Amino acid sequence: MLYPLIRKFFFSLDAETAHGIGMKGIDLMNAAGLACAVAKPVAACPVEVMGLKFPNPVGLAAGLDKNGDHIDGLAKLGFGFIEIGTITPRPQDGNPKPRLFRIPEAQGIINRMGFNNAGVDKLLENVRAAEFPKKGGILGINIGKNATTPIEKAADDYLICLDKVYNDASYVTVNISSPNTKNLRELQKDEALDDLLAQLKAKQLQLAEQYGKYVPMALKIAPDLDDEQITAIADALRRHRFDAVIATNTTLSREGVEGMPNATETGGLSGKPVFEKSTAVQKKLSIALAGELPIIGVGGIMGGEDAAEKIRAGASLVQFYSGFIYRGPDLVSEVAETLAHVMRKSV
């Protein structure tokens, strides 16, 4: 495919500018009926997770399409599911630019975006205008808190978002692990986590009764956790009967990129350098959960074998974002084909 040439052009631009142009390009190809032409056929590998039937276990991680502006174009690339967001109750600009940095030598990306988004109401407009969910496509909506909301009031923002997106989401992801919103990761700790999960579970059950359907919830966690924290999170997820966990978000560590250009930029590191760390956390989480709820493995997937390693470490589904930037649409078909082979062998 031509993506290596396209990437060369994109990488000559500022990262955020290139992102915007790339997303518009996907929309244009979709409108012209050409999106399928740039994507290879994707192997069928149906799986059932969280009570949802996925055509394949390969998902787009949150962050690429924050406002749900590009759902239909992205869907044509063969993803088994798409996650949009992170979205907050009110629109916000996020952190000052520049805030997105590539580390090509390590196939890494550092971002300090800060949940820049157009607000939950705008996202819902886009979701309702998209064809993908109407045709039964699995669409996750990732929710967060506004930067101006005090951390002790964070639950209010998550509850507002959950209430609004519930009827339009296939599943909802609760993001408490971005390193780019002040104190957000404090919500992963002990009483704060317990309180938040309890309130969200109560709201989920209330909404299930209101709408006559159960929409599963996943919690997205950080890779920068010790064994005790991983066990505590697993216990909380079981206690509050959450439906899944996404492991993991970006890391604050700079292991593997030391001394490289942009490596000292503030923000979360994703891409190949986070693979080992995120997979290690996922493996420990899988042991702690003992199969009681599914794991969506994300972090550093740059090829089919990386995704297979996530599955072997206990994941039921996988997602990527940075890999898509470095590898393009071919990564979707490669990962789907590898996982179809891995899952056939395990049956």
Curated annotation (Swiss-Prot):
UniProt-annotated binding residues for FMN: 62-66, 86, 142, 175, 220, 248, 271, 300, 321-322
Compartments (UniProt record): Cell membrane
Gene Ontology biological process terms, A to Z: 'de novo' pyrimidine nucleobase biosynthetic process; 'de novo' UMP biosynthetic process
GO molecular function, one term: dihydroorotate dehydrogenase (quinone) activity
List of catalytic residues: 178 (nucleophile)
Predominant subcellular localization, coarse grouping: membrane
Reaction equations catalysed: (S)-dihydroorotate + a quinone = orotate + a quinol
EC number(s) per entry: 1.3.5.2
Binding site for substrate: 66, 111-115, 175, 180, 249-250
Requisite cofactors: FMN
Membrane-protein topology: Peripheral membrane protein
Manganese among keywords: no
Cofactor info, note text: Binds 1 FMN per subunit.
One GO CC annotation: cytoplasm
UniProt keyword annotations, A-Z: Cell membrane, Flavoprotein, FMN, Membrane, Oxidoreductase, Pyrimidine biosynthesis
Keyword Aminoacyl-tRNA synthetase: no
Broadest EC class assigned to this enzyme: oxidoreductase
Pathway: Pyrimidine metabolism; UMP biosynthesis via de novo pathway; orotate from (S)-dihydroorotate (quinone route): step 1/1
Role: Catalyzes the conversion of dihydroorotate to orotate with quinone as electron acceptor.
Assembly and interaction partners: Monomer.
Similarity comment: Belongs to the dihydroorotate dehydrogenase family. Type 2 subfamily.
Name of the molecule in the record: Dihydroorotate dehydrogenase (quinone)
Gene that specifies this protein: pyrD
